[in-house]
From Swiss-Prot:
Organism: Candida albicans (strain SC5314 / ATCC MYA-2876)
Enzyme class, broadest EC rank: hydrolase
GO cellular component: a single term: mitochondrial inner membrane
Gene coding for it: ATP23
Domain of life: Eukaryota
InterPro entries reported for this sequence: Peptidase_M76_ATP23
Protein name listed in UniProt: Mitochondrial inner membrane protease ATP23
Length: 238
């Protein structure tokens, strides 16, 4: 169970020289990336690769600080942690700060959850505190579903349902974020389209899924029941 990062990087890319990773030149590249001005596809891919592979120790430290802040102050994270604690009852807690781990990832994911290992937050894919909040909330929904519904990731319907719920409840598909990515067109369906897109992408990566077409079919099959299930929240509020 994992949260997809924005883009895949070419395996042929290598880290740029240090002169391009610091100071004015890095500021200039960042501005070009953010505005899209004077940036071709190759330069965009190189910037993303450099961003995700520079200052890794610093990014892990920052990720830990963000995680600690969220575990102390984030309404959505605290709410999910409380409901997960209720499901574990008197058993050994499934989650603590010690097994919500920040690390460098060599795959294009923002995070992941494994029942035996806890939650992984990919420090080199996390750009700011609020993205970490979305990713952590997403993974906490997976933890909740695992405890509440006996989630089986070898069942594609289970996988599709928890991905629909996690993208819906985490805030990753906020309307304003989708407008920034895709413009104002098809405004009324942006939220649903984002959730479906992310769910299909995740299910497609499941080893037992045969094709993207199968992933789309499974997501469509469970859509109505899972999209309308906001537990443990009363409604979608992020």
């Amino acid at each position: 169970m994992s949260t997809a990062a924005p883009q895949e990087n070419s395996p042929e890319l290598k880290l740029s020289p240090s002169s391009k990773l610091n100071g004015f030149e890095w500021w200039r590249r960042t501005l070009s990336y953010q505005t899209g001005l004077g940036l071709n596809a190759e330069e965009k891919a190189q910037y993303e690769f450099d961003y995700n592979n520079r200052n890794l120790a610093e990014k892990c430290q920052q990720c830990n600080e963000y995680r600690n802040w969220m575990l102390e102050y984030s309404p959505s994270v605290l709410f999910m942690m409380d409901h997960i604690k209720k499901l574990t009852k008197d058993k050994e807690p499934i989650l603590t700060k010690e097994n919500i781990t920040c690390d460098v990832c060599d795959f294009t994911k923002g995070g992941g959850f494994h029942p035996d290992e806890g939650i992984l937050l990919c420090a080199n894919w996390i750009r700011n505190k609020w993205q970490l909040e979305d990713i952590l909330t997403h993974e906490l929904v997976h933890v909740y579903d695992y405890l509440k519904f006996n989630l089986d990731m070898n069942n594609l319907r289970h996988h599709a349902c928890t991905e629909i719920r996690a993208s819906m409840l985490s805030g990753e598909c906020r309307i304003w974020q989708e407008i920034k990515k895709t413009g104002l067109g098809n405004f009324g369906k942006k939220f649903q389209d984002c959730i479906k897109r992310r769910a299909v992408l995740s299910v497609s990566s499941n080893p037992i899924c045969k094709s993207p077409e199968e992933a789309e079919k499974v997501v469509s099959t469970v859509w109505n029941s899972c999209f309308n299930d906001t537990r443990p929240f009363e409604r979608v509020y992020r």
